[in-house]
């Protein structure tokens, strides 16, 4: 039994010594850091003729300036009226390519952004933001369908 205790003590001391050495080695290592230029996040959402799915709520938080006319379409996959509006938004994104940015905002994932704009509790809700700070909101599809109604609203900005 005494042999076992001596062996256990020797193993414990040996492992402590190795731990200290590796700790010293870690401190001696240098790390090379590479600087990478990253495009501004706003460049992710350009008026390129597509509807972008929001992946960063901070980009369009209340009070944030937008570089061009921007449509935030607050919707959910389970919402029938939202599914009626989606093809119209996609067509308008193509029609207004280069002029208007279209963003689809899933309220199940970004409910706090929806609430931050005080748009009520119904969807679909569309918020139009202009670079000069003006905004307009529409709840439901009555003012936005057919497509020509929605286009007239965009043209009024």
Regions found by a protein language model. Name each.
Residues 43-69:
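A short beta-strand-turn-helix
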Residues 128-157:
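Non-catalytic, surface beta->alpha helical segment in thiol-disulfide oxidoreductase systems
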Residues 82-96:
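Typically the conserved alpha-helix immediately C-terminal to a functionally engaged Cys/Sec
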Residues 2-7:
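Sec-dependent signal peptide recognition
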Residues 14-15:
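C-terminal motif of bacterial Sec signal peptides marking the signal peptidase cleavage site
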Residues 74, 93, 98-112:
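Thiol-based oxidoreductase modules, predominantly thioredoxin-like and allied folds used
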